[in-house]
Amino acid sequence: MQPDGSLQVEDTVRGVLRDVLGLSAERVADFRADTPLFGALPELDSLAVAGVLTELEDRLGILIEDDEVDGEMLESFGALTRFAAGKALG
């Protein structure tokens, strides 16, 4: 993975979480790799997950298959960012 590309993906993931979940820019800016997401953010319920994944697909130009979606990828900000980077950057 290229560092520049990874940072772009991280910024995109932050933007998606901010926009889809209605989180403040300040709150999302404080997210670290170990910041818990699903089960810890009340805004990220099962319905919101679909919106987040769809928006990631649109913004990153990727396709997320149903069988790729699991609790681990949504466990933390770092896990979601790594998943998105893996799809976007190959």
Predicted regions and their residues:
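Phosphopantetheine-dependent thiolation modules in NRPS/PKS and related acyl-activating systems
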Residues: 1-44, 48-54, 58-59, 63-90
